[in-house]
Design a protein with these regions (language model features):
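Long, amphipathic alpha-helical coupling/dimerization segments that relay conformational signals between
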Residues: 29, 103-132, 146, 151
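Aromatic-anchored, charged helix-turn/loop surface patch used as a conserved interaction hotspot
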Residues: 55-121
Length: 197
């Protein structure tokens, strides 16, 4: 398929190529059912605007693509993962060929989802924001998304959010801000999730 060029897609490909990010995405996708395209969108919007989207726009973004994610992207993803390593007595060369076709279909479906997000919620670039400000905005956007998507993943009063979630989101955010210290990013993510309880 041919798609129009868009900075959001280019941003996502760049971040996804960084060390640890593919594994972090898989961890939150499998462990928490999160939409990776939304995670990338919330980070991209923070980088572009230099401020949080706010809970209303975070929710609007999720509502824009929930049906597509649940009925198109996730079923393709599940089928692709189910075929990894073969499927029962089906010929492995055939199941592998089908799996490769599903990889391409999944990538196209994700690309379509990202273009839809960018169209439905336009963001405007604010160049004056520094990386610290953009980091705070990205972490706030992600925390708002988690609050509406998986409230039980938040920290109980006086407790800590799930460590695997903190680690995966910190790795993703570090891929967005490779110039910032990873320990600081992890602390910011943990604190933002804790505040939402």
């Amino acid at each position: 398929m041919d798609f129009p060029v868009h900075s959001f897609w280019d941003f996502s490909l760049s971040v996804h190529s960084r060390t640890g990010v593919p594994e972090a995405c898989l961890a939150v996708q499998r462990g928490y059912g999160l939409d990776i395209n939304l995670l990338f969108f919330y980070c991209w919007a923070a980088v572009q605007e230099g401020r949080p989207l706010g809970r209303e726009r975070v929710t609007q973004a999720a509502n824009t693509v929930t049906g597509w994610q649940e009925e198109v992207v996730r079923p393709i993803w599940k089928a692709r993962w189910r075929l990894k390593g073969g499927f029962g007595s089906f010929p492995p060369e055939q199941t592998e060929a089908l799996r490769k076709t599903l990889i391409a279909a999944e990538l196209d479906a994700e690309h379509m989802e990202q273009l839809r997000l960018a169209e439905a919620l336009p963001v405007s670039a604010r160049r004056e924001a520094d990386d610290s400000t953009r980091l705070a905005a990205a972490v706030a956007n992600l925390a708002d998304y988690l609050h509406t998507s998986i409230p039980d993943a938040e920290a109980p009063p006086g407790g800590a959010p799930p460590e695997d979630l903190i680690q995966a989101l910190s790795t993703l955010v570090a891929g967005v801000f490779p110039g910032l210290e990873s320990g600081r990013i992890r602390d910011d993510v943990a604190q933002a999730l804790k505040k939402r309880s």
